[in-house]
């Protein structure tokens, strides 16, 4: 069939428009590039490898290689659209420096901490790993080993790693990089609702009358979801978009109301809104009386710093998460000081603007969707901020109904599905269970066929504490998978790098590319990427999606799952468990950790015949390992409000939102008629709490740990840009994305640049007491900070901006604040 260029362009345009509208076009109008008859390309589905939106893409493979990707028109999340990163997914696996063999630091043919990297076999790599792990276990016990994982792990990878650490090695020292992005959201959910993850869903975008972005730049960080907000705003004139941030960015271009606030002052703004609702008789008393309780948080709780830090020592209630029941009148009194005058004074936002924002929440006829990500979570009072937003929605009853939604977005493809739901945090188990609860440990031990007392009750080292323990020589064997924490984490010079290079420690990094973290390691293991393996992710709206392996991996790279399971074969149970445990389970004597964890009659119950022919992990182990792990994991949540569908179902659909009960997904949790766990006649049932009520939690404004001073006179905020994802490990290896934004810059207000006698494009030194970086100045463009604040993205490995970030955390969630620290900028002559 011949087609003119004009007809070709029209057909493509029609197909794109139809996909957005959810329309199926006749075959004659489809995109010819996607026609397998013409190109012999094989197409299959997979969730996108990047952010937590959970877009589905169609992956085109040819001759054993990914050659094209496109938005999946059948996907309810993205409806055929992709963002700029998604359109270049086909290139992320083919960087010229892709790692294909294990690399070990060696000198004179033997391992040496100060040696150079040399290729070795997998057997040699695991031999040295096992030697180091066994020596550490014998000398110091299970608290001397640790693992740092990822919200990019597949569900099965995270589950296998957590099981290996907590059941096999009996160490809770496993944490994901989601500690740096979603931990405050988790604790906020648990404190208010007794159960994690959003009650709303993406359908709220088509139902809300007002959108409020609390410190989120969705236009660049969640661009596909931003198109849904844009469509709603432009097609419904009554809809309002509100954007709150410490600097101007692309999301302001759509905003009806923009608010530039002083760092940390979002606490005061949220408390003012609650006060406004009360003072203007906008409380939904029927909802509040039936469905909420009022509580007061302990205050002056410190900043998650080392115990000997003066700021930590000065705190009256360091790290206290205590909640005290109070009356509504006491709650009213607690927010009364936050008048519009006081909120304006603290935040720097005009009084009229604050009142306009409060009115939208207070109007009973306006359905409001609040949205946030890192701006709120990466905050030394991030848990409080999460709860202050819930307070506003609970006071007005604007929750868990279409368009009324406090919605915590996620930044990684499975921060929800793996880090949170699987429980790869140092204190968690699957399905919101925790290691400190003996009943929860008993459930896990029963499912995993462990003797009582196997799982340690004390939470392990969280991400920031892992760095400190490596630095101090307490944590000695450390395995990093699927993240680049040497570039992404805080306070690199003071804590992390010295810990990695501590002669007492042995650091292993699994990665497809030679990242900053890999280059600081002792052993680097090459990993399979994305569709080089089978897996599942869980996105921000509780949607679990699965995909099949579609191409072979490159060289000798292996999946993170393969690495964990193979490593487990290196240990006999006598080498990892004490005699008293073995006496309770003598059947495990002489068996390997692999036998105990994975050849347990559950994980290995599904025969290889059920797997696809292309499934390297399944064929290596001799059974359908992904299905076995998923089904064992799903046992934790079924019947407990975290129900997942059978594994095979996920390969036939574009994901399902849990809880999935009787084959039906759940759109709005806690709402009778939508959530199968909400009791009949309840209206709303916050069943995560024993009394079925949500907590409204009073918490004040408290200042950040550091503020600008005479020497360090500017605020520094770090973050991302549209074209790159996190540390740029994948996106900077895509030529088109690299060319679009090759280098990080420091975005400055022109007046601040003028004061320092620097011009756009000139190189400056950004410094504070923790380090310094050289970077070029940008005074125009997409990001426009106010005077007194600068913004630098962290994707550029040549500009390790996070060296400057203090490792202060929210004391409750242990999540780092990457959004505010003082710096100075000087011109480089």
UniProtKB/Swiss-Prot annotation:
Keywords: 4Fe-4S, Electron transport, Iron, Iron-sulfur, Metal-binding, Molybdenum, Nitrate assimilation, Oxidoreductase, Periplasm, Signal, Transport. InterPro entries: Asp_de-COase-like_dom_sf, CT_Nitrate-R-NapA-like, MoPterin_dinucl-bd_dom, Mopterin_OxRdtase, Mopterin_OxRdtase_4Fe-4S_dom, MopterinOxRdtase_cofactor_BS, Periplasm_NO3_reductase_lsu, Prok_molybdopt-oxidoreductase. Substrate binds at residue 794. Mo-bis(molybdopterin guanine dinucleotide) binds at residues 85, 152, 177, 181, 214-221, 245-249, 264-266, 374, 378, 484, 510-511, 533, 560, 718-727, 802, 819. Pfam families: Molybdop_Fe4S4, Molybdopterin, Molydop_binding. It is an enzyme of class 1 (oxidoreductase). [4Fe-4S] cluster binds at residues 48, 51, 55, 83. Binds 1 [4Fe-4S] cluster. Binds 1 molybdenum-bis(molybdopterin guanine dinucleotide) (Mo-bis-MGD) cofactor per subunit. It is found in: Periplasm. It catalyses: 2 Fe(II)-[cytochrome] + nitrate + 2 H(+) = 2 Fe(III)-[cytochrome] + nitrite + H2O. Its EC number is 1.9.6.1. Its cofactor is [4Fe-4S] cluster; Mo-bis(molybdopterin guanine dinucleotide). GO terms for cellular component: membrane; nitrate reductase complex; periplasmic space. GO terms for biological process: cellular respiration; Mo-molybdopterin cofactor biosynthetic process; nitrate assimilation. Component of the periplasmic nitrate reductase NapAB complex composed of NapA and NapB. Belongs to the prokaryotic molybdopterin-containing oxidoreductase family. NasA/NapA/NarB subfamily. This is Periplasmic nitrate reductase. The lineage of its organism: Bacteria, Pseudomonadati, Pseudomonadota, Gammaproteobacteria, Vibrionales.
């Amino acid at each position: 069939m011949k087609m003119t260029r004009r007809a070709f362009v029209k057909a493509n345009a029609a197909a794109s428009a139809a996909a957005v509208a959810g329309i199926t076009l006749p075959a004659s109008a489809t995109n010819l590039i996607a026609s397998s008859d013409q190109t012999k390309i094989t197409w299959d589905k997979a969730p996108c490898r990047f952010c937590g939106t959970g877009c589905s893409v169609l992956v085109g493979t040819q001759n054993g290689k990914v050659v094209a990707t496109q938005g999946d028109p059948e996907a309810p999340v993205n409806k055929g659209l992709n963002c700029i990163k998604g359109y270049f997914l086909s290139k992320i696996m083919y960087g010229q420096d892709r790692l294909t063999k294990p690399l070990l630091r060696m000198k004179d043919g033997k391992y040496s901490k100060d040696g150079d990297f040399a290729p070795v076999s997998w057997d040699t790599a695991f031999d040295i790993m096992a030697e180091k792990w066994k020596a550490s276990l014998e000398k110091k016990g299970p608290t001397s080993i640790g693992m740092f994982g990822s919200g990019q792990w597949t569900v099965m990878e995270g589950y296998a790693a957590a099981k290996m650490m907590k059941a096999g090695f009996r160490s809770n020292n496993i944490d994901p990089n989601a500690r740096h992005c979603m931990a405050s959201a988790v604790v906020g959910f648990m404190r208010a609702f007794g159960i994690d993850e959003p009650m709303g869903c993406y359908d709220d975008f088509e139902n809300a009358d007002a959108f409020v972005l609390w410190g989120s730049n969705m236009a660049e960080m969640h661009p596909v979801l931003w198109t849904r907000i844009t469509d709603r705003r432009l097609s419904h004139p009554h809809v309002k978009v509100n954007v709150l941030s410490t600097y101007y960015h692309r999301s302001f271009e759509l905003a009806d109301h923009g608010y530039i606030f002083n760092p940390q002052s979002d606490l005061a703004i949220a408390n003012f809104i609650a006060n406004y609702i009360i003072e203007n008789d906008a409380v939904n008393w029927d909802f509040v009386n039936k469905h909420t309780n009022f509580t007061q948080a302990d205050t002056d709780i410190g900043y998650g710093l080392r115990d000997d830090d003066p700021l930590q020592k000065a705190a009256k209630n360091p790290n206290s998460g205590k909640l005290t029941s109070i009356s509504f009148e006491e709650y009213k009194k607690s927010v009364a000081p936050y008048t519009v005058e006081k909120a304006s004074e603290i935040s720097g936002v005009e009084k009229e603007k604050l009142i306009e924002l409060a009115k939208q929440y207070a109007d009973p006829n306006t359905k409001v969707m609040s949205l946030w990500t890192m701006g709120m979570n990466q905050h030394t009072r991030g848990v409080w901020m999460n709860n202050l937003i819930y307070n506003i929605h609970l006071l007005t009853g604007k929750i868990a109904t279409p368009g009324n939604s406090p919605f915590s977005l996620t930044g990684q493809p499975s921060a929800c599905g793996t880090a949170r739901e699987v429980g790869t945090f140092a204190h968690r188990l699957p399905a919101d269970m925790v290691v400190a609860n003996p009943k929860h440990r008993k459930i896990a031990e029963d499912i995993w066929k462990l003797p009582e007392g196997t799982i340690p009750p004390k939470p392990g080292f969280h991400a920031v504490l892992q760095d400190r323990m490596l630095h101090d020589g307490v944590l000695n064997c450390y395995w990093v998978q699927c993240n680049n924490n040497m570039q992404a984490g805080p306070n690199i010079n003071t804590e992390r790098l010295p810990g990695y290079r501590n002669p007492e420690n042995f650091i292993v990094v699994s990665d497809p590319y030679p990242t900053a973290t890999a280059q600081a390691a002792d052993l680097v293991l090459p990993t399979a990427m994305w569709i080089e393996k089978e897996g599942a992710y869980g996105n921000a709206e509780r949607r679990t999606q699965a995909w099949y392996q579609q191409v072979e991996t490159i060289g000798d790279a292996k999946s993170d799952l393969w690495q964990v399971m193979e490593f487990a074969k290196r240990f006999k149970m006598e080498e990892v468990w004490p005699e008293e445990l073995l006496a309770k389970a003598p059947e495990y004597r002489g068996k390997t950790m692999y036998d105990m964890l994975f050849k347990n009659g559950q994980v290995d119950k599904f025969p290889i015949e059920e797997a696809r022919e292309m499934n390297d992990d399944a064929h290596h182990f001799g059974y359908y390992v992904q299905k076995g792990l998923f089904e064992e994991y799903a046992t934790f949540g079924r019947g407990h409000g975290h129900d997942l569908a059978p594994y095979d179902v996920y390969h036939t659909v574009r994901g399902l939102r849990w809880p999935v009960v009787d084959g039906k997904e759940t759109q709005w949790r806690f709402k009778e008629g939508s959530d199968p766990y909400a009791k009949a006649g309840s209206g709303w049932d916050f069943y995560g709490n024993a009394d079925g009520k949500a907590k409204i939690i009073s918490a004040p404004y408290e200042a950040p740990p550091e503020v600008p001073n005479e020497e360090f006179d500017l605020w520094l905020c770090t973050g991302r840009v549209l074209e790159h994802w996190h540390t740029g490990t994948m996106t900077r290896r895509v030529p088109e994305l690299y060319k679009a934004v090759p280098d990080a810059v420091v975005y400055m207000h022109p007046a601040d640049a003028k004061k320092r006698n620097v011009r756009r494009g000139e190189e400056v030194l950004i410094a504070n007491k923790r380090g310094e970086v050289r970077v070029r100045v940008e005074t125009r463009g997409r990001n426009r900070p106010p005077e007194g604040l600068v913004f630098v993205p962290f994707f550029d490995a040549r500009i390790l901006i996070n060296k400057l970030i203090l490792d202060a955390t929210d004391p409750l969630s242990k999540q780092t604040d990457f959004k505010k620290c003082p710096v100075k900028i000087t011109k480089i002559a």
